[in-house]
């Protein structure tokens, strides 16, 4: 929100349910994170849905699997953190909060967390106490930036934001980026600020639409013969 608070909404089921809730509240903000979850750790439930939060201050969304989440979870519990979900993702929020409380910035906290995390992940995080940007990180899981007009996006796939922009920056493994509506900064695995190429991709509306099919999986099945050719 513009009043330095975070509107936190989660639903189970169709994305339309979340859209309806957001439309009803009409939150005013210049930044946000969102996520559609394929359940790997924990059942499909509102408690297991993203974004996950820590201490009402750090909020994250995460794609991928944290392989050493059991030991990291136990360590954070010993440090006084309470878990409210069954997911491996929630520990990322607590870990970032832990490092931020040691006088690290969100970017510094993300690098410290990366040293602890084993597995594949694409992460986007917001710190309520420094909510001018979103910090993202990639390791073995797709993550890209989308450059719009007075707006910048992060996503796992170009199709997710194809209706908003055709200009993309594909982040590399180890990259951490800070993004706001006005600018983006990318840092590599060695914490050096770097420049990544901008790729222009024209994606048709047909590629993002379900068309006559009931869902995207059905569409992909019927498109396989053409894809193979």
Predicted regions and their residues:
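Conserved short alpha-helical segments that host acidic/polar catalytic motifs at enzyme active sites
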Residues: 1-216, 223-229
């Amino acid at each position: 929100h513009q009043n330095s608070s975070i509107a936190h909404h989660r639903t189970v089921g169709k994305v339309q349910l979340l859209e309806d809730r957001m439309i009803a509240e009409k939150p005013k903000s210049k930044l946000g994170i969102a996520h559609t979850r394929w359940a790997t750790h924990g059942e499909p439930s509102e408690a297991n849905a993203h974004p996950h939060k820590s201490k009402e201050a750090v909020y994250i969304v995460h794609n991928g699997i944290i392989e050493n989440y059991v030991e990291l979870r136990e360590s954070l519990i010993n440090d006084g953190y309470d878990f409210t979900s069954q997911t491996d993702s929630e520990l990322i929020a607590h870990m970032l909060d832990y490092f931020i409380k040691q006088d690290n910035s969100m970017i510094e906290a993300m690098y410290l967390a990366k040293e602890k995390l084993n597995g594949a992940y694409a992460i986007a995080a917001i710190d309520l106490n420094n909510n001018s940007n979103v910090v993202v990180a990639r390791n073995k899981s797709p993550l890209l930036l989308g450059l719009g007009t007075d707006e910048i996006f992060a996503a796992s796939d170009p199709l997710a934001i194809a209706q908003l922009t055709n200009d993309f920056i594909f982040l590399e493994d180890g990259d951490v980026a800070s993004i706001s509506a006005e600018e983006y900064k990318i840092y590599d695995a060695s914490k050096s600020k770097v420049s990544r190429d901008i790729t222009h991709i024209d994606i048709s509306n047909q590629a993002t639409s379900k068309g006559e099919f009931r869902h995207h999986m059905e569409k992909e099945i019927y498109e396989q013969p053409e894809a193979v050719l």
